[in-house]
Amino acid sequence: MDLLLGIIQGLTEFLPVSSSGHLTLLSHLLKTDLNAYQTAVLHLGTLVSVVLFAFDGIRRSLRSWRIILNLIVSTIPAGVFGVLFEKQIDQLFSSPRFLPLFFSVTALILMFTRYSSSGEKRMENMSFLDALLVGIAQLFALFPGISRSGITVSSLLFMKYRGEDALQYSFLMSIPVVLGAGILGLEKGNVTILAPIFAFLSGLFALYVLSRSVRSGKIWQFSYYCLFVAILSYLVG
């Protein structure tokens, strides 16, 4: 079970297909009780993988006070919403009822990137407004089925940021959110140490695939898979 949870978490955390949605669906299929805090513990494994994978870029980015301030702004919406509606969000992980809707939303967002022309805006020059907007977008990824990487990268592409910068900023945004959720998960979850290890290893592979898809402008292709999972979750729900 730990092997399966870890691999699914690692692959789906960074591929724009929603790790929380997959774990909620798996929990339903296997008749297991996997809540939001337990998935957060798995996030700690993928947190290590993103830090290692993008270490040089993260180190360079954090030398800029503007980027640091923007990250704080981007983190506030999801952080505040997650604290205020903690119980309601956790309840969403106990049932696949809304998975078809949320997976479909992710599919549509990804598909729209196919028709979005590439931009030239740089992460170093991001305005506080853009930082807030992408932070609000990340807020919706608290719902299982809506991909955090998918919605943040897509939002930045819609705002005409370069693919490389959209990817890098999405990586940076994930660190405080995943770390905070993971710490809570250590207190309330029930996942052994093996699951985060498997999540770390599969997460490295997923990061490589995501990077190639964003740089080649083909992140939209994951929309087909999300639509498939939306249909599957509807059939089994």
UniProtKB/Swiss-Prot annotation:
Topology relative to the membrane: Multi-pass membrane protein
Gene Ontology biological process: cell wall organization; peptidoglycan biosynthetic process; regulation of cell shape; response to antibiotic
Recorded superkingdom: Bacteria
Reactions that this protein is recorded to catalyse: di-trans,octa-cis-undecaprenyl diphosphate + H2O = di-trans,octa-cis-undecaprenyl phosphate + phosphate + H(+)
Pfam families per UniProt: BacA
Localization annotation: Cell inner membrane
The UniProt record lists the keyword Hydrolase: yes
Keyword Cell membrane: yes
Annotated TM spans: 38-58, 65-85, 92-112, 126-146, 166-186, 191-211, 217-237
Assigned GO CC terms: plasma membrane
Keywords: Antibiotic resistance, Cell inner membrane, Cell membrane, Cell shape, Cell wall biogenesis/degradation, Hydrolase, Membrane, Peptidoglycan synthesis, Transmembrane, Transmembrane helix
Enzyme Commission no: 3.6.1.27
UniProt enzyme class: hydrolase
Further facts: Bacitracin is thought to be involved in the inhibition of peptidoglycan synthesis by sequestering undecaprenyl diphosphate, thereby reducing the pool of lipid carrier available.
Family per record: Belongs to the UppP family.
Function: Catalyzes the dephosphorylation of undecaprenyl diphosphate (UPP). Confers resistance to bacitracin.
The protein's name: Undecaprenyl-diphosphatase
Lineage, uppermost ranks: Bacteria, Thermotogati, Thermotogota, Thermotogae, Thermotogales
Gene encoding the protein: uppP
